[in-house]
Each structure stands twice: as C-alpha cells, then as structure tokens.
Amino acid sequence: MKSFTLAGLVLLIALRSVFCAETNHNFGKWEKEISAYEASDKTNHPPKGALLFIGSSTVRLWKSLPQDFPNAKVVNRGFGGSQIVDSTHFAKRVIFPYKPSKVFLRAGGNDLWQGKSAEEVFSDFRDFVARVHEKLPKTEIVFISLSPSIARWKQADKEKAVNTMVQEFVKKNPEVKYIDTYPLPLGSDGQPRPEVFVADKLHFNAEGYKLLAECVRPFVQK
C-alpha cells in the first residue's frame, strides 16, 4: 500500500510539473502541423503497435525513416523547432491514438537553445515519460540522445549534461532506453564534421542520417 501511494505521489508531482510548464508555453504555433497529422490519420491511419518517432526537426526531416527500417512499421510525428514539452502536450493527439509499442524521442536541443538549463530539459524529459506511461504503461520509451552541431557547438557541454542525466535515469527505469548519438557527428579532433550536415550546419544531411540510422537500428530490431 505504501509503495502504491508513493508511486502515485511521484506520478502526481510529475503531472503537476507538466501542467505548470504548459501554462507558460505557446503551443498554438504547432496547431497547423498537428492538425495536418490528424487529417492524414483519417485517410491513412498508422497501424497500432508501430514504432513512433517524435521530436524536433531531426525527426521531422528524417525522410528516409521507412527505408532505413524496412522490416518495421514506423510512424514519423516530428515537428521542427519543437521542445520536449511540445511532444508531451500533444501526446494525446499524436502518440496515444496509435498505441505504439515503442516511442523514440529526439528533442532537447531547441530547449537549450531557447535558454533552458540542462536540469530543466531533463525535468521535461521525465514529465514526457510520466505522461506517456500514464496512458501507455507498457510502451517502451527510447531517448535518442542529443548530439552536437557546428551551428550550436557552444551548447555541447549542456547537451552532454542532459545525456548524462537521462543515462542515470534509464538505469533505474527499465522501460526507458537510451541511444548514445553524441559521438556520431564528431571527427578524430573531437569537432563536428561538416560533411554530415546540410548548409545550415545544424541539421543532418543524407550521410548524417545514415549514421543516425545505424545507431538506432539495434533498438528497432529488439
């Protein structure tokens, strides 16, 4: 009884944190994209139990996702420029209806760029996990870690900090997994390689996505 009460209290605190974050964030700017996904679902509803990818532009621009994992049923619900709180807020519209077997989240970089601390981003991640598992307790959540870019190199240490906190969280939560992609764009000198980015030096090009797919593939096949 005590363990149940404690678990319920932890969930309540997490959901209260979600509510507080949402009252100070503008979600309206994503309405057009979210509505477009819902309209598409009416004519081509994704299969239940699929692998759902959600997050910011790294997910949205992953056009080769179905080809990279041809033997899996994958659903892309990324919306560029979004933060973790956006995926949490819109979960009831672009996660829950599909009842995915796994949710792959790649987000957090925009959060840091907009001034959030690594601790705040990690807190938002925990809120995301709580929201998803409140509705889908058996769905595995896979965090695709943050990785540095040329354009945002100055936040690389904060990205490392977020990754480290998520890794520690995963150790205590077996229903959550972590994919380390931080080294993916780095060269032998420890700097991001221009050849894996498009002209904006922020987003991956085809070569970058090829490397990303290699990192993610073992978690798709499990």
Named regions from a protein language model:
Residues P148-K222:
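Catalytic His-Asp segment of secreted/periplasmic serine-dependent ester chemistry enzymes
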